[in-house]
Amino acid sequence: MASTSLVDSLTSHFPLTLPIPTPITHPHLIPSADLPVEEDLLHNPENLRSWLSYIHNVKEKIAADEPAKGGVLSPEEEILGPLASKNARDGLQRLVSIYERAIAVFPTSYKLWKAYYLTRQSYVLGELTNDAKEARSQQAKRGAAYKTNVRELLDGAEEAHEWTGGLDPVVGYAEWRSLVATGERMIMCLPNLPIPWLLHLGVLLHPKCPSVFKNGSYARRAFDRALRTLPPSLHGRVWGLYLRWAEIVGGDAGERVWRRYLKVDPSLTERHITYLLEAEEPRPLAAAKYLLSIARRAQQNLYSSLEGKSPYQLFVDFLELVEKYADQIGMDEEGTLELQRTKRAVEEKVDGEQPQVEGQEQQPQEEPASINGRLMRIAGPPVPLEQGKLFKPVNAASAQAPTQLTYDEDTDPSNPRLLDVEGIVERDGLQVYKDQAGRLWTGLATYWIKRGEFERATATFERGLAAVVTIRDFTQIFDAYAEFSETMISTLMDALADEDNLEDEDFDAEETEQELDERMKSFEELMDRRPFLVNDVLLRRNPNEVVEWEKRIALHGDDDAKVVEAYVKALDTINPRKATGPLYPLYVNFAKFYEEGGSKDDNGEPRNEPDLEQARKIFERATKVPFKAVDELAEVWCEWAEMELRNENYEEAIRLMQRATTVPKNTKINYYDDNIPPQSRLFKSLKLWSYYSDLEESIGTVESTKAVYDKIMELKIANAQVIVNYATFLEENKYFEESFKVYERGIELFHFPIAFEIWNIYLSKFVKRYGGKKLERARDLFEQALENCPEKFCKPLYLMYAKLEEEHGLAKRAMGIYDRAASTVQDSDKFEMYTIYIAKATANFGLPATRPIYERALESLPDKQTAEMCRRFARMERKLGEIDRARAIYAHASQFCDPRIEPEFWQEWNDFEIETGSEDTFREMLRIKRAVQASFNTETSFIAAQAAAASKGTEKPTDTSAQEAQDAADPMAAMERELSAAGADGARKGGAPAFVASTLNKTNANGIDEGGEETGEMANPDAIVMDEDEF
């Protein structure tokens, strides 16, 4: 009763501004202090600045007189909001009076109307929140692009229209109505400006706005009037408030507004879908249809998701929504089957129509129902697409057809018909996103599970397993299928274990147990079928995969009937020209299956009798298959002959080979031409002929074998191995001369390096056969072999030739052959060849005879090998007592040996000088060493030395000292310093100065004396001078 009296007392304060207060009706509106200003305005009413100044002063006085607000609001303050105090109510009346008199003078002043309406709003709507003030401040700073972006405007409308306080809509209804009426007057005076419209429409978003204005038709008509009045460039600002109002109001009215906008701009569809699902009363059917619509548009590049989602992601969102609200979105199983039957009937009717008779005019056919998607809703009832006229403005030069999809009930949110989820997933999902079939099939099955259609879900899983073509999709479906089966079994077991269910009369325990048994049996069968299902997936992906067919056959194990069925299906399915891998093993294994009597029992015995006739039929069929390669066809014939041999049908095997190797009249067929059937190229298959020759060698006669080999060589398909086999066969049968002729024929057919292998075998066989009996013939053969032999291959032939001469000929001729070999072989073999030559010359003629060989070796060998040969040469001279010659050879070799890389050489020379030399020779060796080191002391040589030392595993060389570098740069100055130091030592020892006689001999770049051995102090007076002829 107290609350009623409070409301009545508060309601009595209103209306405040209706009718408009005037000084006549409300004398307190003009205090005595304001009379001068009022008189001034009466005399000069057209001065807008005076009016605004007067209003500003009045607002300041009202604000100063306003009492301070406490922390806790009283009931009056909660209901009346800003108008809770008498000072505020009087101030409102006073301001309204002044504003109304000013507007009467300036009815089209935008500045005056805006200030007036904002003032009225502040007393009715309350105060904006801090977030709303900040949002409006940020919006004011944005550019012109923001004013046309409806998405940002919609978000801004939600942020910028939040208030605290406000006048109660019941108590202050009269004041709310007066505010709305004032807004109507403002937009009538300023109809073409957007701000007045936005201020007026913003009132309708206030949470305390009376429902008669907010939820009724008034708000919708006000927004529509704004869209009709303002130019299209400003419609975005209106739509931002309009859509926000539609979200606040909700219901059918709000949904109709959203549908109107989304027809023009579908970019906000995802936001609207979120709103539909998060509303107090979710509308999943409409949301699903919206999702399906944008998924289809995105797939046709007619829609771009603001959230960056792909068409597939949008369709998955639709599928997830269907899974979540299965009962509210999709049809039941009966409805789905009925719709499928209708579609099939329509398709059969269209396919069964008779073709038009020639000369008869075609009659227009009646447009079918919307099942085939041929209808488009333009306005009113559905009309055929062909009857929809293209709208063309009067002033337009041309018009284009709108890029929109034809009308479909599945994408019309206003249509209450439930969706055919199964058909949609098959048409829009599985046929479009074939690489994501696993997710789509499991989603469809989950939909049926959520609806309780477990049999339909099981059938869906089975269809998915039978349709996917990737292991990933198969695994996804199979795991979901197994999980569903386990869940069903667990649920049935829990139901049987629940005692409450046993006491329930409606619970049929026997039926539940029977269903549980069936489920468990199906689950076991599913697990057993997994290898076969995986194999099916791989074969669907590539039915020409031979290996997978072999795995399929192996999976059947001992089931002979299934094995035969798998073989037959594989051979009927595989395209021989597209087979992956060799195809012939399938035919061979199939024939062996019959040959061996099928699978074997536990004792290893065949379960059936061998069936050679059936095996021969399979081989016969295989010989007519157009394989990709001739070798596969050759393998078939060889395996067929092998089967006959295993069954001791030797004559039949020979006949098969004769049949397979039949030579046609036209032998100029290109063996490598894949356009020619392999059967026509089979006679040139070396594999087939090789098997035939081996077969003849085993069970045939010598003459028949020779005939086969001769035919191979006649067809010019023989290789080196065939030549060797043929010659070896003749040799084993004591046809030695014929075997040698075969070698010669092979040499004529082939060039090096293949001819080298034949020569190598031929010569070794010839020498082994005749030895020294036919020496001249053997020499001719060797000369013939070496005549065109490349230097890369001639070394073994020279060695064999020389060995022949050593064993059966003359040593002098052998030395000549070694000499020829040393100058003929390639550079990498010369060092070894000279080593052999020197060893043979030493053995036959002694050490002195090797001097000219060494000299020729030093001229022809590379630097590195020359150094090694010099060391050997020097050792030989030292053995002969020729010390000076050995020293000269060391000096010659020094130019090739970097001390940092070849320390062994210098150590050997050092030891030589210590053992056989003098102080002068030792000093000369040191001088040469420094000169050589100087010649190698360059950046490139140093890097090469480092690399060579690293490859040898020794310590890396380091740079010489400054003094050594200086000495290397000036070898003569270094020698003078050394001699001066030696003289000083002698003076200290002998007490008198010592002088060293100098000699002026010519030296080369490395400091080696180029004078004769007889000149200078370093000459050996006992040296023996010999000419080359005396060797």
From Swiss-Prot:
Gene Ontology terms: cellular component: post-mRNA release spliceosomal complex; Prp19 complex; U2-type catalytic step 2 spliceosome
Primary location: nucleus
Domain of life: Eukaryota
InterPro entries registered for this protein in UniProt: HAT (IPR003107), HAT_Syf1-like_N (IPR055433), HAT_Syf1_central (IPR056350), HAT_Syf1_CNRKL1_C (IPR055430), Syf1-like (IPR045075), TPR-like_helical_dom_sf (IPR011990), TPR_rpt (IPR019734)
Keyword Nucleus in record: yes
Keyword Nucleus among record annotations: yes
Entry keywords, A to Z: mRNA processing, mRNA splicing, Nucleus, Repeat, Spliceosome
Residue stretches of biased makeup (Low complexity): 353-368
A biological-process GO annotation: generation of catalytic spliceosome for first transesterification step
HAT repeats: 28-60, 90-122, 214-248, 250-269, 452-487, 610-646, 664-698, 700-732, 734-768, 773-807, 845-879, 881-915
Database matches in SUPFAM superfamilies: TPR-like
Similarity-based family: Belongs to the crooked-neck family.
Subunit structure, interactors included: Associated with the spliceosome.
The protein's name in its UniProt record: Pre-mRNA-splicing factor SYF1
Source organism (scientific name): Cryptococcus neoformans var. neoformans serotype D (strain JEC21 / ATCC MYA-565)
Organism lineage: Eukaryota, Fungi, Dikarya, Basidiomycota, Agaricomycotina
Gene: SYF1
